[in-house]
Amino acid sequence: MRRRRLLALACVSATLLSGCSLLSSDDGDGRRTVTVWLMKSSASDDFLKRFTEDFEKTHSDLDLDIRIQEWTGIGEKVQTALKSDGGDEQPDVIEVGNTQVPQYAEGGKLEDLTLESMRDWGIRDWLPGLAEPGEYMSQQFGIPWYAANRVVIYRKDLFKEAGITSPPRTREEWITATEKLNQGGAQGIYLAGQDWYTLSGLIWDEGGELATGSGGAWTGALDSEEALRGMEFYQRLQKLGNGPVDADEEHPPQSGVFAKGRVAQIISVPGLATTILRENPDLKDKLGFFPVPGKTADKPGAVFTGGSDLVVPQNTDNRDGAIAVIEALAGAKWNTELARTMNYVPNKKSLAADVAGEEGVEAMAAGAAQGRATPSTPRWGAVEGDNPIKAYMTKVLNGADARTSAKEASRRITELLDPNTR
């Protein structure tokens, strides 16, 4: 509990005896300040200026103090803030990565926002890839703000050369098209062997999971039949290009590979096109985007959804103000405006049509409806740090037995999620 709250409670008691006036965190004019931590580059300066002006105009009792944070070291800084006893710089609202919510919610350090989510904020329409990791122990702590997910970036000119007139909509169409593209000195697709985010989507599309949880215990699940089918498709796709089997998409950066060679496709967030064009301006007007194809043409494939949620520290002394900020930032008006400004996907499936018109964002929004996130456990960070999924992928792509390798990787995931199994 924060110092200001304790002082205010003490003053309430003193009032009964001596007429002490209540302490408050207002600015002297009856307005209370809501301190908001947002991450660098999540929103433009112009957007934040317009939002602040509108919010303070429509909330006559509140002032906004938005403080921009760096991603480097943010985990430790947030944990410190959540344990603090107070101070005027203490945040009332914090932007966090969507998969980080459980580690902050553990131990009761965040406000439970389940009631507001169900009653006021349209929880059933939220993108699952943002909503699911925002839930911990059946309570909603993270409120979806914005999303970004992978699509296929492709060379329109190479598709035309190969006689492909429209992007594929199913996995089998995708394989057929990529086989046509993978000839004549061109790579059908550049897919690094350790792109586990893409593999995750293929596994989810098959009905599999990276890990399964029950009663707070988690078990690695890469050895399920569904997960093995996802890896099998990854193998088929990956061999239709020259991606390294022992590295991820950042080693080397796939934007540079795509920009400098005859590469027909990569899997990435649409924003990478800006980097590609900076490295090779000759590709202007030659880039296209389509959702990662699904098993059937009626819906895109599942994808890993990255993005941010908004949380309220349990030690805030201005819960009402924090709720008002989240209601505005995550509401339809400003959420759609943020998506248009920053080329994001809005937090609700019903808002996808509001960002139609930009090819990359449109493809991303279509895929986001099938978006997922990593298992909602505070210990998932340990899995990403050790990352037995990457090692498993490289083994299989080098010819190892998939089922045996998957069992080994699943066993390691279980150990990392539940140290008691060691």
Regions found by a protein language model. Give the residues of each.
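Hinge/lid segment of periplasmic solute-binding proteins
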Residues: G97-N149, I175, L202, G288-F290, ...
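Extracytoplasmic/periplasmic solute-binding protein
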Residues: M137-W145, R150, E172-G220, E226, ...
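Glycine-centered hinge/linker elements that transmit conformational signals in sensory
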Residues: T178-E179, A217-A247
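Long, aromatic- and glycine/proline-rich binding clefts that accommodate carbohydrate-like moieties
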Residues: G129, F290-P291, A339-N387, P419-R422
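Extracytoplasmic/periplasmic substrate-binding proteins
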Residues: M39, E232-N318
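Extracytoplasmic "Venus flytrap"/periplasmic binding protein-like
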Residues: D54, T58-W126, E161-A162, R169, ...
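A structural signal for short loop-to-beta-strand junctions that line the ligand-binding cleft
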Residues: K83, E89-D92, D120-L158, Q187-G188, ...
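Conserved C-terminal helix/tail region of periplasmic/extracytoplasmic solute-binding proteins
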Residues: K160, A369-R422
